[in-house]
UniProtKB/Swiss-Prot annotation:
EC number: 1.14.11.-
Binding-site residues, Fe cation: 98, 100, 161
GO BP, one annotated term: intracellular iron ion homeostasis
GO function terms (MF aspect): 2-oxoglutarate-dependent dioxygenase activity; iron ion binding; L-ascorbic acid binding
SMART domains with a match to the protein in the record: P4Hc (SM00702)
CC cofactor: Fe(2+); L-ascorbate
Keyword Oxidoreductase tagged: yes
Full protein name: PKHD-type hydroxylase RPD_3334
Superkingdom of source: Bacteria
Keywords from the named record: Dioxygenase, Iron, Metal-binding, Oxidoreductase, Vitamin C
Xref: PANTHER family: PKHD-TYPE HYDROXYLASE YBIX
Cofactor binding note of this UniProt entry: Binds 1 Fe(2+) ion per subunit.
Native organism: Rhodopseudomonas palustris (strain BisB5)
């Protein structure tokens, strides 16, 4: 399941993020890559332990957890501290086909998570750069994603994916992973679809409608059955 969510950050917030990031020192992005990923990764990254990266990451997590669509799609248990990368045409930056590590650990906090979902939050407008599409492969084929600044995309961390070479400008983004309460991707997809149907019924019939109440009960009982907390 690939889900795009608009306006996690406002345009004003994106501008503020970019102003701060443009003043920062960047390092080789391979510093946080696994052995296989490091062979195909060419980009720059804010130092994960920098005060700026941590501060901006906290703001992103706060915005995400306040977004109903994100919570519905991810059912998050633990969110890894967001990281920040930059793909510049001047560096021939790209990230070849790879799969994310199954487990990620944060040396600063000791947090360890199973990576169920990967998230990219775009911090550059599509017209600021050429190339730089996120390409995610699944059983239905390849999906290219290039969203407006402030929007994010969620996709299963088990997916093969890549970032195509940037040929003009710079692609700036935040990327991170999360562990969901719902381990199974198919179950998580059904929960998301069911929640969407319930919200549509609430708009049409009201929250107190008997059928809405019944379906809401089914939703929570499925969460109870599947959730790891």
């Amino acid at each position: 399941m690939l889900v795009c969510i608009p306006e996690i950050l406002s345009k004003h917030e994106v501008t503020e993020f970019r102003r701060l990031m443009d003043q920062a020192d960047w390092e080789d992005g391979r510093s946080t890559a696994g052995a296989q990923s490091a062979m195909v990764k060419r980009n720059e990254q804010l130092p994960p332990d920098s005060e700026l990266a941590r501060m901006l990451g906290r703001r992103i997590v706060s915005a995400l957890t306040a977004n109903p669509k994100f919570v519905s799609a991810a059912v998050p248990l633990q969110i890894f501290p967001p990281l920040f990368n930059r793909y510049a045409a001047s560096g021939n930056h790209h990230f070849g086909i790879h799969v994310d590590n199954a487990v990620r650990g944060d040396p600063l906090t000791g947090l360890r998570i199973r990576t169920d979902l990967s998230v990219t939050l775009f911090l550059a407008e599509p017209d600021e750069y050429d190339g730089g599409e996120l390409v995610v492969e699944d059983t239905y084929g390849s999906h290219e994603v290039k969203l407006p600044a402030g929007d994010c995309v969620l996709y299963p961390s088990s997916s093969l994916h890549m970032v195509t070479p940037v040929t003009r400008g710079a692609r700036v983004a935040s990327f991170f992973w999360l562990q969901s309460m719902i381990r199974d991707a198919h179950a998580r997809s059904m929960i998301y679809d069911l929640d969407g149907a319930i919200q549509a019924l609430v708009e049409r019939l009201g929250r107190d409608d008997p059928e809405t109440v019944k379906l809401t009960g089914i939703y929570h009982n499925l969460i109870r059955y599947w959730a790891d907390v």
